Amino acid sequence: MAFKKKFAPRRKFCRFCADKELPIDYKRADILRDFITERGKIIARRITGTCAHHQRVLTREIKRARQMALLIYTATHSSDVKKKSIL
């Protein structure tokens, strides 16, 4: 017996297509942080809802921001933080 979904999932939309004035720039780290995890990984477009074009641009700008040290490459491990606090 198959169960029907009670509701349809909300369709995701590209934030940058909806707002043409919103720039994707490596200097705008506050916007770029919305598209990376707390561990520093880039979130997939099927999760964020961005279109293919803007996901490519977003990935390029995140990588530029990492090189300029505006964003982190990876998060520090909690075990590393504990070791430093003991010493």
Curated annotation (Swiss-Prot):
The keyword NAD does not apply. SUPFAM superfamilies: Ribosomal protein S18. One of its GO terms (biological process) is translation. Pfam families: Ribosomal_S18. One of its GO terms (molecular function) is structural constituent of ribosome. Signal peptide: none annotated. GO terms for cellular component: cytosolic small ribosomal subunit. The keyword Ribonucleoprotein applies. Keywords: Ribonucleoprotein, Ribosomal protein, RNA-binding, rRNA-binding. It comes from the Bacteria. Belongs to the bacterial ribosomal protein bS18 family. Part of the 30S ribosomal subunit. Forms a tight heterodimer with protein bS6. Binds as a heterodimer with protein bS6 to the central domain of the 16S rRNA, where it helps stabilize the platform of the 30S subunit. This is Small ribosomal subunit protein bS18.
